[in-house]
A protein has these predicted regions:
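N-terminal leader/targeting pre-sequences
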Residues: 1-176
Length: 176
């Protein structure tokens, strides 16, 4: 299976992503930034995440939330109005569509490629992707005990902001 999937994976990553998000840090984590690119792949989506400025090396919860945009509220340490984890079929945690594997940071940087068959790119356009301060424990309801929101980005069709195509951790960032 891997021998058959790898060429498709490389072909997919050589294309432009369909949905993108630029991650910004919360008021308590202003140096956190990054990008997430989403590609259609098999029966779902392939997500590529590159996040810098994480507070420490370790694990962080990583979830798609119900709505965007990500707005930092005055006097509020997270992001306002993004709702709970994305769950169109109202599944309990960790089975809802917005559940993603934890981000693993080393020297304040995390890079991840993950496949999900729980959604296609068009279903997450306009929704928020959130980095949480603690790792998801995959048990506690409704959020996996992943703590506060330290970073957030809103998914948009990539062509709207003319992103550069990702080419790995050393690529150019999205234009401002």
């Amino acid at each position: 299976m891997l021998k058959q999937t790898m060429p498709l994976l490389f072909e997919t990553l050589s294309q432009y992503p369909v949905v993108c998000a630029r991650i910004m840090g919360s008021q308590l984590n202003p140096n956190l930034k990054g990008e997430v690119w989403v590609y259609p792949f098999l029966e779902g989506s392939l997500l590529v995440a590159d996040i810098q400025g994480l507070p420490f090396s370790g694990f962080y919860g990583f979830h798609i939330h119900q709505t965007g945009p990500c707005v930092v509220g005055e006097g509020y340490t997270g992001f306002r109005g993004i709702g709970g984890h994305y769950s169109p079929t109202e599944q309990p945690h960790p089975y809802h569509s917005g559940d993603l594997p934890v981000l693993m940071a080393y020297y304040n940087h995390a890079f991840m490629i993950v496949y999900s068959d729980r959604f296609v790119p068009s279903e997450i356009t306009g929704r928020a992707i959130v980095v949480h301060q603690f790792p998801d424990d995959y048990r506690t309801q409704p959020t996996g005990d992943s703590g506060g929101q330290i970073g957030c980005g809103t998914f948009y069709p990539c062509f709207e902001k003319n992103p550069t195509r990702p080419s790995g951790p050393a690529r150019t960032s999205l234009p401002t």
